[in-house]
Amino acid sequence: MTRTASLSRRQLLRGATVIAVGGASALLTACGESALTAEDGSTPSPSPAAPTSAPATAAAATQAPTPPTASPTPPTATRVDMLPRATVAPTTPAPTAAPTTPPATPAPSPTATPIQAADVVLADGAITLPGSVVARREPRLIAPESHHRGQIEIWRSGGWQTNFDLSVVSYGEILSGGVPRDGIPPIDAPTFVAAPEADAWLDDREPVVVFGANGETRAYPLQILTWHEIANDVVGGRPVAVTFCPLCNSALVFDREVLGATMRFGVSGNLRNSDLIMWDDLTETWWQQLTGEGIVGDLAGYFLDPLPSQLIGYGEFKASFPNGMVLGRDTGFRRDYGRNPYPGYDAARGSPFLFRGELDDRLRSGERVVAIEIGGEAVAYAFTHLQSVGVVNDVVGGLPVVVFWSPETASALDARAIADAKAVGSGVAFGREVAGRTLTFEPGDGAFTDRETGSTWSIAGEAVAGALEGIQLPPVVHANHFWFAWAAFYPETRLVK
């Protein structure tokens, strides 16, 4: 089987026949206790605040280049008892570079018809990369420089079958996080418990990632995700990857169905701009976690489908979703769940850990923001601003949105015990159009009110009282990032502070 590593970029784009590319080995089990548990069974405590010693859990935090610019479909309000699926997230992400159709080898006649970029079959036929995507990424591909060849050979000798001839980023931007592939093991067989059982070890202020699909809603505590960074799950029949990069405070959910195949995602052990770089088990493409773009490998230039989620306090999750389930501690790994392996990290000053980019001085690098990108427009809402106003009504990419503020959510990166951490708050975003009417929200005592009907809304975006009771605002894809991380990949972002 021929790998694309032996093919030039021009061959990939001009091939009149489908190109078959060998698939990567399916690594369906995580690397046990690698790098996180000592031989005697103890769990060392990494310390990101001390960059002289790479933390064992500084596994990767990766961000993807500019996300798709397709205009979202306006959300429609529905009566539901769970978080609805995304109605505003782009369903067919694509890079922002203008699509082109590369011509064939120079033709003798000016009337010759250019050869269209061929579809590319990957992973032993499991995935077909559309020719349109192949064509779009061509102008963005970056050939490895000679001084990067040595590092590429080290990766290959370590077992990587990634197609390193295809990259949309410079290899000089990729740094080792100090652990091998899946040295921070993802959770591949998650188990869930009801709230009464989770109450024994999960404080109401602790942050949880909330995701729902097809009648199921689940919470993923950061006290667990901090140690694993990825949970490969199936929610309501939908395969998803719930991801968290502690170094960037970025919690995002992605669809694991990619071009018709279901992928398992792992932690590459590498970072770019301090952000986690994930990998998939079918093509071994490397993916930027913060934006979901394939940056190295056969699927470089392709974007994962992001799904809307919320980062809120566990108590708020229970109040909004009384039947929701919680990711349990029975993960198959021995970890000191509840203990923060990055104590004091979010209070650190200066350049973030393993960050080599330029810092945007519009905010302190470690300040949190609610970040949204819709229709090519990126916006960040500073936590300090949200704390002072309680709610923000805005329009992003032509879509009316609202950002709700919750003040009590604890930091997962402050005190050694997350339950004892300071409150940093959290922000959630929704579309604010209901039945063709744009609502305007105001903060209240633990809830929110719209001016148009006087209905009361919860932090989860559900009307709990008033004329619109039972209506759920459609969520938008957003996250609570550290400012430096968001600004590194969206330098033109509009900042609301």
Protein language model regions, located:
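N-terminal secretory signal peptides
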Residues: 1-11, 15-31
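Short, intrinsically disordered low-complexity segments
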Residues: 2, 8-9, 13, 78, ...
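Secondary-structure transition/capping residues
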Residues: 23-27, 36-38, 328, 497
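Residue-level detector of alpha-helical recognition elements and their boundaries
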Residues: 27-28, 62, 260, 332
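Ser/Thr-rich, Proline-interspersed low-complexity disordered segments
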Residues: 35-145
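Mid-to-C-terminal functional-domain signal that highlights helix-capping/loop sites
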Residues: 114-497
